[in-house]
């Protein structure tokens, strides 16, 4: 979901954040468990105290800003865009071999991954083989970064 999702595709991308949040809060109140909700930058305005994570913080070829909401404190990453250089995009329904690819409005978001293998490399994913899966994925470095924080919180609480 994103608040900037075009109106004609909103049926395919409903805002499930409030529903999921309520279910997770109920579960956490019963169990004492911790949770994280992930979404794209356009959803940050409907998330509660979201933190931003950027691929440049992990030396990845993607920036892939994602926002995370949790029922515990999470530390965000810094962005290191200058050190990273031109990011590689992994999005859409196919890789893009055309170096001069531009969006319909004429702007560029950077260079798009040229192949599935290229997408896997810049995302830090070595097991996925389908472009759609890679384009939808959260880089494993993000999961490790946030998962380590959750484990630390659980160990502290024990």
Regions found by a protein language model. Name each.
Residues 1-158:
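Conserved active-site and SAM-binding loop architecture
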